[in-house]
Amino acid sequence: MPDYGHPLRFATFISPANSPAHRPVELAQLSERLGFDFVTFQDHPYKADFLDTWTLLSWVAARTERIGLAGNVLNLPLRQPPAVLARASASLDLLSGGRTSLGLGAGFFWDAVQAAGGRRLTPMQGVTALSEAIDVIRGIWDADGPGTLYVEGEFYKVRDAERGPAPAHDIPIWIGAQKPKMQDLVGRKADGWLPSLPTMEPGGLPKGNAIIDDAARDAGRDPRDITRLLNILPGQQTAEALAQMTLEDGVSIFILASDDPDMLQRFAAETIPAVRDHVARGRT
């Protein structure tokens, strides 16, 4: 697949561990000082040893100035209802000065989700519920839309809901998608595809891009409008290999999963400049 031409950006993926509670905040602040574009946190609300991700994002927003913020990805079955999630994300965007992105997942670890009070869904139900949730979220954000909001879905029924507030900027919706049905949803409704390289099958990037691009065109969208992100592990790929993923598979945001300050510093000082150099030469 081609390079979609998006600006090259980098992010960190930090565990929201609560012992000590201030540690994820310090790593987020370090990420900002090192020049990363985003800091992201996984979302497992059923884990007692994790901070609540949404509370953490709000606290990090208050303790940083520039860096973008996102869940990676928010567990939709436990972030209910979507209208409230829409207002929460718009509020964070307003308070942070337009730094919020909304990473969403259909749900995983269903035993834990159900134990915490969430509804267990089949894979197809999860896709449908996420699709409906996106409609609700975008409808709430559309503060100048006509009248009140109505969404009559299988999982979410919103009737006569007030719209707003509008976020400070157009919040991108990134979907964590590994399977074809979810990738199809990315192409139809999302602003970004956020898979994880460690769990991806060989050839997963070009295969996923093909599904997303076809779905986007079928929906009357330009595939180039969809950002391609990728979670990566330290040392998993060389700078040359990462640059190749940009030039051949369109990945424009690489997200480093590490809680090691030294690793974050080395990646920022060595890998990021090398990737930028390779991509710049490849794009000329």
Regions found by a protein language model. Name each.
Residues M1-T284:
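Active-site-adjacent structural elements that line small-molecule/cofactor binding pockets in enzymes
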